[in-house]
Each structure stands twice: as C-alpha cells, then as structure tokens.
C-alpha cells in the first residue's frame, strides 16, 4: 500500500516515486500523510519533507510552495528544492552562523525578510542532514 509522491520545481521534477508515508513542512506545522488520507490542499513552508520508503527515511528540503493530497496521490509544487546528499553539514552550520549574524545586523524590512529566509534555509539544511545521518 503506497502513496504516489511528485515534487515539482519550476526547473525540474525533484521527486516522482511511491512511498509508505510522507511528512510535509506545512505553514501550520508538520503534516503526516498515510494511505487513505482525506483530500487536502496546504501551503508548504521552507523545511524538510521526510519520505518513508519501506523502513528508510529520505529527507528533501522544500523551499515553499503548495501540496495537494487526493486519492493517495500527493502533488507538491515548490519554489525550489535541495537534495540532502549534496549538503555538507560543516558548510551548513557556517551558513547558519552567517545568516544569524546578517539577521541581527539587518537595518530595514527588506533586509530582515531576506535574512530570515536565508536563516530558515540554513536550519532546514542542517535538519535534513541530521535526518540522513540517523
């Protein structure tokens, strides 16, 4: 019994496979989806999507978008996505420190918004790398 999951970014199809379970980073918190889930349309936040195939969890970083769940099919349209296998934890931690410093030094709303987005991406990269390491 599986779910069909498709993650589509503007430039490519990020994921197109079947899985037993998916946990989405929605704008209202984490949403777990199993076979037979009721129809759902939700906004996707910057964060880590976790996909369970058999007993293994695969993390994918989503950079905002929308998800539709219907008839055991999950279609996720995202602004962007990153594969975790390409993330170096040391660089991610350095980026988190840099993003935190830039946010603390931001002087106007535009800079604060941009710095906040960069901080959230950096946190998601670290979280995804940790999921993969466990």
UniProtKB/Swiss-Prot annotation:
Gene3D superfamilies reported for this sequence: F0F1 ATP synthase delta/epsilon subunit, N-terminal, Helix hairpin bin
One annotated GO molecular function: proton-transporting ATP synthase activity, rotational mechanism
CDD domains reported in the protein's UniProt record: F1-ATPase_delta (cd12152)
Topology versus the membrane: Peripheral membrane protein
Listed GO CC annotations: chloroplast thylakoid membrane; proton-transporting ATP synthase complex
Stored SUPFAM superfamilies: Epsilon subunit of F1F0-ATP synthase N-terminal domain
Major subcellular location class: plastid
Localisation per UniProt entry: Plastid, Chloroplast thylakoid membrane
Coiled-coil regions listed in the entry: none
Entries under InterPro entries matching the protein: ATP_synth_F1_dsu/esu, ATP_synth_F1_dsu/esu_N, ATP_synth_F1_esu_C, ATPsynth_dsu/esu_N
Subunit text: F-type ATPases have 2 components, CF(1) - the catalytic core - and CF(0) - the membrane proton channel. CF(1) has five subunits: alpha(3), beta(3), gamma(1), delta(1), epsilon(1). CF(0) has three main subunits: a, b and c.
Entry similarity comment: Belongs to the ATPase epsilon chain family.
Function of the protein: Produces ATP from ADP in the presence of a proton gradient across the membrane.
NCBIfam families cross-referenced by the UniProt entry: ATP_synt_epsi
Protein's UniProt name: ATP synthase epsilon chain, chloroplastic
Species this chain originates from: Gracilaria tenuistipitata var. liui
């Amino acid at each position: 019994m599986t779910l069909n999951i498709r993650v589509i970014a503007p430039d490519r199809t990020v994921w197109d496979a079947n899985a037993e379970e998916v946990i989405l980073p929605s704008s209202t918190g984490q949403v777990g989806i199993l076979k037979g889930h009721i129809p759902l349309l939700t906004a996707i936040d910057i964060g880590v999507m976790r996909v369970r195939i058999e007993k293994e969890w695969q993390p994918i970083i989503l950079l905002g978008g929308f998800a539709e769940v219907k008839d055991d099919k999950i279609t996720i349209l995202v602004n962007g996505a990153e594969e975790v296998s390409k993330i170096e934890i040391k660089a991610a931690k350095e980026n988190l420190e840099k993003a935190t410093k830039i946010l603390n030094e931001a002087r106007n709303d535009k800079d604060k918004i941009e710095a906040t987005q960069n901080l959230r991406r950096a946190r998601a990269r670290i979280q995804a790398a940790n999921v993969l390491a466990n």
